[in-house]
Design a protein with these regions (language model features):
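Short, structured segments at the rim of ligand-binding sites
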Residues: 1-414
């Protein structure tokens, strides 16, 4: 599907979807908790639906009610082996690998798109050192797990994916004894591990932080909080806020200003670029602004690179985004894809090993290829609002992965 966007005003209001990061964690913990959990905002993104489908195969029941979802936890061990289709969701795969191992489930994980190329070796190695047999097969790609995870020390690199750490945090309390997560280097995107800690607290569990990682008690049972309110997604709000700075104003609703989501840092980052952003009871409003160039290290908030890149393409003076080498292993090589997309629209963008450099010359328009990456497609749409000529976004349906309502909101009558 192709969508052509003419330069002009952004929608005046946008409601962001349920936080994908919070949603994965909440669904998995609710599936393992004592008692049912009610989520007032039902998931809609492809990634969260993938997690729900896998949990359903593992024995979880979901009852959809009007504007809510009731989660009934896993009732008993399902027949083995399970086939768990993670679709294109890295979070689903990396969270459920250790959870299935902790439950002693024999499971075959499958996926599609770029998921088979995304790294998981260090996580599998940690599981294999603690009682699990794992076999990775190609053509078709799948990972088969067998055995039951045993308590102990789990060593992980910190510079590959914080999702490894979060997956173990979710799983290790289920083991018969205490365990420890030990990081062999500094943890990138540490805020996402902090988000997992916060969600664990909401299900009644406190972890102990150590200089090298965490100590995790064993033999625990998660306690459902009953009703679990989740916030809106700050990584998606970032696109609307960038759109407001370029072609606003845009008022974003559905966000928790005190959220633990790392992507909440989009507010000070845009203000660092001289953006005018105001908070009110109605929401967060970004106004048209004369953006100025700046340098941003996105190692702690890598999902913000695409919306920041769209804004930096129009900023006065040079801008740089650094700390983003891991984005080469996302749904696309997000660095190369973002640079190529903006160049195709007439931008002066230099790709660096771990980031991008922008001359801030503005964009002409043309055809934007997001390489099947939902975040690149949304960045192209935001940039199109301030281009001199129309922009045609190819493969526009890829936004279904995280934000199915995106185009409906974006193309509303202004």
């Amino acid at each position: 599907m192709e969508i052509t966007i003419c330069p002009g005003k952004a929608p005046r209001r946008a409601a962001v979807p349920l936080s994908k990061s919070e949603g994965h964690r909440a669904l998995i913990l609710a599936a393992m908790a004592q008692g049912e959990t009610l989520l007032p905002r039902p998931p809609a993104s492809g990634d969260l639906l993938a997690t729900m489908d896998c949990l359903r195969q593992m024995g979880t029941s979901f009852t959809e009610r009007e504007n809510s979802l009731l989660v009934t936890p896993i009732a008993g061990p399902p027949a083995a082996p399970l086939r768990l289709d993670c679709r294109e969701s890295g979070s689903t795969l990396r969270f459920l690998l250790p959870v299935a191992a902790a439950l002693g489930l024999r499971a075959i994980f499958t996926g599609r798109g770029r998921l088979p190329q995304r790294p998981v070796e260090a996580l599998l190695a940690a599981l294999q050192r603690n009682g699990i047999t794992a076999e990775v097969r190609q053509h078709p790609w799948e990972i088969e797990l067998a055995g039951r995870l045993t308590p102990g020390a789990f060593s992980l690199p910190g510079n590959v994916s914080s999702q490894y750490v979060s997956g173990l945090m979710l799983a290790l309390p289920l083991l018969t004894g205490p365990s420890e997560i030990r990081l062999t280097g500094a943890l990138e995107s540490a805020g996402y591990a902090g988000m997992t800690e916060e969600m664990l607290r909401r299900f009644g569990l406190e972890l102990e932080k150590t200089p090298m990682g965490w100590r995790i008690p064993g033999g625990m049972k998660y306690q459902s909080p009953g009703r679990l309110a989740l916030g809106g997604d700050w990584s998606h709000a970032a696109f609307w806020l960038a759109a407001g700075c370029l072609a606003g104003p845009v008022t974003v609703t559905g966000l928790e200003p005190e959220s633990t989501q790392p992507d909440r840092v989009i507010l000070p980052l845009l203000r660092q670029m001289s953006a005018r952003i105001e908070l009110s009871p109605e929401g967060i409003t970004a106004y048209p602004s004369r953006l100025t160039g700046t340098a941003v290290d996105v190692s702690g908030c890598p999902d913000l690179l695409p919306p920041l890149a769209a804004a930096m393409a129009f900023a006065k003076r040079e801008s740089r985004l650094t700390g983003a080498a891991r984005l080469r292993l996302k749904e696309s090589d997000r660095l190369a894809g973002m640079a190529g997309l903006l160049r195709a629209l007439g931008g002066r963008v230099e790709e660096e090993p771990d980031g991008l450099r922008f001359a801030g010359s503005g964009l002409r328009g043309g055809v934007a290829d997001p390489c099947g990456d939902h975040r690149l497609a949304m960045a192209a749409a935001v940039a199109a609002l301030a281009c001199r000529e129309p922009v045609t976004v190819k493969d526009a349906e890829c936004v279904e992965k995280s934000y199915p309502a995106w185009w409906g909101l974006f193309c509303e009558e202004k």
